[in-house]
Amino acid sequence: MKTARRRSRELAVQAVYQSLINRTAAPEIAKNIREMPDFAKADEELFNKLFFGTQTNAADYIQKIRPLLDRDEKDLNPIERAVLLTACHELSAMPETPYPVIINEAIEVTKTFGGTDGHKFVNGILDKLAAQIRPDEPKRR
């Protein structure tokens, strides 16, 4: 069973994906997401923080992600890009959530929406990103 927070992360990634693909304004995308049946089971506050925070800071986040990529940024799958941007926001702006939780949630969201091995790619990038963004947080064992 998915938690409200997982649903919020999935919906935020879907919203970021829509913004990358359709170039629709964020308020319109959020309105459309809120009309989805799954939204009633989501944490609305978390969705808002993730989606609007990612939208506001996406240019900064891609600057943090770009040097960690093993391919050209243009070759990134849009789902992987949306997951990485959303997780980068959560790592940067939500210190109350431990980074292993953020990475695990991003992996699970990528497994749901991404390609066959996309979750492995996302895991590798986010491990490096977490070390940069949260260098003082205790490491996983």
UniProtKB/Swiss-Prot annotation:
Highest taxon listed in the record's lineage: Bacteria
UniProt xrefs under InterPro entries: NusB-like_sf, NusB_fam, NusB_RsmB_TIM44
Pfam families according to UniProt: NusB (PF01029)
Family membership noted in the UniProt record: Belongs to the NusB family.
Function: Involved in transcription antitermination. Required for transcription of ribosomal RNA (rRNA) genes. Binds specifically to the boxA antiterminator sequence of the ribosomal RNA (rrn) operons.
Protein name, entry field: Transcription antitermination protein NusB
Phylogenetic placement of the source organism: Bacteria, Pseudomonadati, Pseudomonadota, Betaproteobacteria, Neisseriales
Entry-linked PANTHER family: ANTITERMINATION NUSB DOMAIN-CONTAINING PROTEIN, N UTILIZATION SUBSTANCE PROTEIN B-RELATED
Gene Ontology terms for molecular function: RNA binding
One annotated Gene Ontology cellular component of this protein: cytosol
Keyword set, alphabetical order: RNA-binding, Transcription, Transcription antitermination, Transcription regulation
GO biological process terms on file: DNA-templated transcription termination; transcription antitermination
